[in-house]
Every structure is written in C-alpha cells, then in structure tokens.
C-alpha cells in the first residue's frame, strides 16, 4: 500500500535524504520519497511485513518523527513548533544584542576578564536554550553515522565558543607570552545561531505558501454534518458518518461526503436544489440536483437544500482522492532531484573536510595570529555552506507548480509527468466527449435522422485551446470514428489541421506509435475506454475528469472540468516549473561555489585583505535558503 505520512523535525535536505535512505533500507518498504517542503514521506510498503509503528521507531532513532496517528493534528504540532521557533528566534536576537553591547564595550563592565565572562554566560545561555536542537540533532546524527545542516551549525558554534572560552581563562598565559594578540568570538557563536534561526523562521513562513493549495483543498471538507434520525436532525462530527446515513445539507453549507440526493427543494423549483461544484470541476454555473443526482464532498448548495444518502465517506470521497493524488504528486521527485539528494548526503562531510583543510592551511601560513585566523576561517566555511538551498530548489518549485495546477482543476500524477509535459510537441485528441459534447437541445430518439453538425456541439473554449496549443508550436491531430465529411467539419470548426476519420481504438494507438517513431513527444487526450490503449502508450496521457474511471486511472494528467484551455495552461505551467527548478539549482550551486572559497579566505592569495566573517556567513546562509523558496513562490503569479 502507498501512504503519505507527515514528518516532523526536518531542517534541511540532508535530513530528508537521511530519512529517505533509512526508510528504503527497511524490509517491507518498496520505495520511499521524502519531501522537505511538504514535510511528508510518500511510502510504498507491505503492511504484512512492516508496520507503521516499526517505521516510526526507526525514524525516531534518527531524531525525527513520523505522525502515524490519524487523530493527531499535524497542523497543531506544526503551529506549536512555529511558535517555539519564533520565541527562540526573538530571544536569540536579544542575546545577540546583549553580547554585541558587551563585546564592543558599548556597556562598560570594567576589566576585560569580566567582559569576556559575561559574554561567555550570554553565549552559553543562547546555545543551551535557543540552539539546543542543533546539538541534540547533530549528536543523534553522529550516532547513526550521518550528518546534516545541524552538524555544521553545532560544529561552527561549538568551535567558536570553546576557543573563546579557552582564551577567556588562559589567553594571557598562553598567547600573550608569545606576543600574540588574542580575542574572543562569543559574538560569532551567538550571531550564527541567531541568523540560522531567523533563516528557518522565514523559510517556514515561505514554505507555508508552497503548501497553501493543499490546505485550501483540505479546508473544503466540513468538520461536522447534519444527520437525519427520524424526526430529529443532529449536528455530528464528520468522522462519525457512515455509508447509508441520511444527511441534510442547507444553503451555504459544504457537502460532507459523496452521496445521492433523495429529496431536494429550492425557491426556484419544488424538486431541485442548485450546487456550486466549481471547486471540483471548474464549472462556474451551479449544477441542478434532483432525486437520484450524485453530489460530491466539498461542493456547496447555492440555492435550496436537500437530503442525501451517504455513498462514499472518509478517504473514499472524490475530494479525498484528489487531495491524496495531489499530495503524492507533490511528494514525488523529478529525476534531477535524485542527483541532488545524493549530493546532499555527501555535502556535509565534504564541507567538513574543506573546513579542516582551510584550518590547516591558515595554521601553516598564518604567522603570529595563525591559530585564531585558522579557527575563524574554518568556522566561516562550516557556517556558509548550505545544503538547504540545493535541497529546496526542486521540491519547492514542484509543490507550487502542482498545487497551482490543482487549483485550476488540473491533477498531475507526479513530478515526472509535470516534467514531461514541457517536452510535448504533438497532441492527439479524441473527438466525441473530448472536443465535442452531445447537443442538449435535440430529441435523442430522433438524433440518427439529424445532420451530424446538429447532433453535437463544440465544447466552449475548444477552438481557443487548440489555437493556443498551435501558437506554442504543438501540432494537433484529431481522431474520430465519424465519416470523412463529419471529421473534416469538426476539425475545421476546432481549428485543427490534421485529422483522421473512421478510426478504431487500434488506429489511435498506431498513430501515437508512428509519431513517436518520427521523434515526436506525444500527448494523448481522451475520455473513454476506447482511448486507454493510446493513453497508455503516449509520452503524456491526459484524461477528461468526467470520462471513464479507466481513462483517469491510466492518465498522468486529469482535467476535472470540460474546459480544454486547461491543456495549454498545464503545458505552460510545466515549462515555467522546470525553468524555475533549474534557476533555483543554478543559484544554489553558484552560492556554494562562490561563497565557500570567500569564507575560506581565498582573496588573500590575490592580495585582497578580506574574507567573509562567521557572522556574515550565517546571514548569507539563511538568505540563500529563503531566496530559493521565495523564488519558487513566483510561480503562483506567472502566466
């Protein structure tokens, strides 16, 4: 079975990579993919071999937590953690101001010894309370032979603090006798923690934006429902509703579960209500619901009220299925992310080695102040290195892109489908049910005697959608079982240059094969069982949501409504998202490639007496992560 499980405690890409690596080593886990911005793990496992409790215990040992109890509110846990992070960040800023006032002698405490001892106490308090998680996490990682961003923070602040403590008590005895001017760096150890916490606070706030679409979908389901029990109507928790229960839904209320209308009324008609289904289908006109009509969870009666019999409840509703599909898509990984994850696993050890080399080089060539210079340069290297920016580059863009698609009633199966969409250069479309719909104004008992152009009508926006696709350089082929005259008529009406008539299901599959053999990347759009072979063969398969379940199961992209303009929108969104991923990765790698040598003091080799200090390094590191998330959020406003 496949399940998306919330994960608590991740701070960087090394965290998610370590959790993913651990899960994939467990017997009974077929595959696991961990999303840092999504704060979740998508796990495909055999429950007869391994339980959720066993997985939770293994991840707890690493210092993280899998939330497997469905009664536990993940939102409440995350809110508490966010409030605690805000409190620690604010207090750390106060500690930073205090230590700066003392270290810079803005507050005169008399002797240098007293000044250093007060700074030591401030730094220690900051480390023990505000920075405690860095040391606890890095210790747990060390026990399991792994490392993450917390390891770099713990190492850098620990080294700066211990060296400063040594100088506070033994500086004169050890350094002054050798003619070396010594300093303490408590301000650096405090400021590093402050800037890292500030960066994480801003990052969490920004990451909330990437998950806004899924939260909006979850908010579509009500917390309670009105259950009819004889002559009584009671308001009960949604979780208590069972299949077969009779429910009453009033104007403005959200439909609690999927079901069938058994009675309806409104001021317009005595036997029907009107329900806004735009949040599911994108259709702006309220749908008429009479006895026997199907209603979906999350939709809202705009006029009238009705009673319904519950048919699908809980995780079986269409809304729950959509939410699950979007969560799985957001938790999936683009091919490039696999490479980044491997880099994240070795990034921290590599940075630690670079810091060690930096220390040794400065110690050997640094002259009288060799040791202090060597230590501060190594600390700056440890602080400025940022695996978070690399780790966030791909998943944040994917979360925003897939979430934006879902808000437009476009369901994308996974990251690979989103990435493939941008490469499409040919679209093959079915006619009946995809481009056209039956004419509602005719008597269907006499339809066979009517001209073909009167039996069907072109879907609204179909012509505009086909024109937009062709403007994007995508060839469109229409497949129809009609005779040539009818097929040519509908192709011309839709603005399609290439069409095939009298086709059988096998012909659709053959056309897809021929186009692929010619080097084309083919997208197939259809809505029926006779399209499934071609859908399965296409590079990208697109199903109409009102089509058959078989077509939707095969498809990589599902359009929940009838508006075909969603197809060019999906392709443009794919192009924007992939471009954003590469943009994010470029800046994340450039940041590390440029900043690590500058922190190590490379400019001294060219006669420039400047390098990035540990305090500035921590600020730059925080900025790099936040900037990647904010850059991804630009997708929400891109057209």
Locations of the language-model features?
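Flexible metal-binding regulatory segments at protein termini and peripheral loops
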Residues: 1-116, 140, 216, 232-233, ...
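Conserved cytosolic catalytic loops of P-type ATPases
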Residues: 4, 27-49, 53, 183-186, ...
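Conserved ATP-binding TGD loop and adjacent catalytic N/P-domain core of P-type ATPases
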Residues: 17, 38, 412, 422, ...
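Soluble-to-membrane junctions at the N-terminal ends of transmembrane alpha-helices
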Residues: 75-94, 117, 137-160, 323-355, ...
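Transmembrane helix-loop-helix hairpins at the membrane interface
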Residues: 84-224, 342, 612-615
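Membrane-embedded alpha-helical bundles of multi-pass transporters
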Residues: 108-111, 143, 162, 404, ...
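Juxtamembrane coupling segments of multi-pass membrane pumps/enzymes
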Residues: 175, 188-251, 289, 411-413, ...
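Conserved catalytic phosphorylation-site environment of P-type ATPases
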Residues: 280, 376, 386-447, 451, ...
């Amino acid at each position: 079975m496949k399940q998306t499980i919330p994960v608590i405690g991740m701070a960087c890409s090394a965290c998610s990579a370590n959790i993913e690596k651990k899960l994939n080593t467990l017997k009974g886990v077929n595959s696991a993919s961990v999303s840092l911005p999504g704060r979740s793990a998508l796990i495909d496992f055999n429950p007869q071999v391994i339980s959720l409790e066993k997985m939770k215990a293994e991840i707890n040992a690493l210092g993280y937590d899998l939330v497997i109890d469905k009664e536990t509110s993940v939102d409440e846990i995350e809110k508490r953690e966010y409030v605690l992070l805000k409190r620690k960040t604010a207090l750390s800023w106060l500690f930073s101001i205090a230590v700066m006032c003392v270290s810079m002698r803005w507050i005169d405490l008399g002797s240098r010894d007293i000044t250093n001892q007060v700074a030591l106490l401030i730094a220690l308090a900051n480390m023990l309370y505000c920075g405690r998680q860095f040391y606890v996490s890095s210790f747990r990682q060390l026990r399991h032979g792994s490392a993450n961003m917390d390891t770099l923070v713990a190492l850098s602040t620990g080294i700066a603090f211990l060296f400063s403590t040594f100088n506070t008590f033994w500086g004169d005895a050890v350094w002054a006798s050798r003619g070396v001017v010594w300093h303490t760096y408590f301000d650096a150890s405090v400021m590093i923690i402050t800037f890292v916490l500030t960066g994480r606070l801003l990052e969490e706030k920004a990451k909330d934006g990437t998950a806004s679409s899924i939260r909006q979908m979850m908010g579509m389901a009500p917390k309670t429902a009105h259950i009819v029990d004889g002559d009584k109507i009671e308001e009960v928790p949604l979780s208590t509703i069972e299949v077969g229960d009779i429910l009453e839904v009033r104007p403005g209320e959200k439909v609690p579960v999927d079901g069938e209308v058994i009675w309806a009324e409104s001021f317009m008609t005595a036997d029907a209500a009107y329900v806004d289904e735009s949040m599911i289908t994108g259709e702006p006109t309220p749908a008429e619901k009479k006895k026997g009509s199907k209603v979906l969870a999350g939709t809202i009666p705009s006029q009238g009220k009705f009673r319904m019999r519950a048919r699908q409840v809980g995780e079986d509703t269409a809304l729950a299925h959509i939410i699950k599909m979007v969560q799985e898509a957001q938790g999936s990984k683009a091919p490039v992310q696999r490479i980044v994850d491997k880099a994240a696993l070795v990034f921290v050890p590599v940075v630690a080695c670079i810091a060690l080399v930096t220390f040794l080089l400065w110690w050997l060539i640094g002259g009288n102040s060799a040791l202090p210079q060597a230590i501060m340069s190594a600390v700056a290297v440890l602080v400025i290195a940022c695996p978070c920016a690399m780790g966030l580059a791909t998943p944040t863009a994917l979360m925003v892109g897939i979430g934006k698609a879902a808000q437009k009633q476009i369901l994308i199966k996974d990251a690979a489908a989103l990435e493939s969409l941008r490469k499409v250069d040919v679209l093959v479309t079915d006619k009946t049910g995809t481009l056209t719909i039956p004419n509602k104004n005719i008597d269907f008992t006499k339809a066979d005697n009517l001209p073909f152009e009167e039996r069907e009508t072109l879907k609204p926006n179909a012509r505009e959608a086909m024109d937009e696709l062709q403007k994007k350089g995508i060839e469109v082929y229409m497949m129809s079982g009609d005779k040539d005259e009818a097929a040519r008529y509908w192709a011309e009406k839709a603005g399609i240059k290439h069409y095939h008539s009298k086709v059988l299901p096998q012909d659709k599959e053959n056309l897809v094969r021929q186009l692929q053999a010619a080097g084309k990347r083919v997208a197939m759009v259809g809505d029926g069982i006779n399209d499934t072979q071609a859908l399965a063969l296409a590079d990208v398969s697109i199903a109409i949501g009102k089509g058959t379940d078989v077509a939707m199961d095969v498809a990589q992209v599902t359009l929940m409504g009838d508006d075909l303009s969603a197809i060019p929108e999906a392709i443009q969104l794919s192009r924007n998202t992939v471009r954003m991923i590469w943009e994010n990765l470029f800046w994340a790698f450039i940041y590390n490639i440029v900043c690590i040598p500058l922190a190590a003091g490379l400019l001294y080799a060219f006669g420039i007496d400047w390098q990035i200090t540990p305090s500035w390094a921590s600020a730059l590191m925080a900025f790099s992560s936040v900037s990647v998330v904010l850059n991804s959020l630009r997708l929400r406003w891109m057209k």
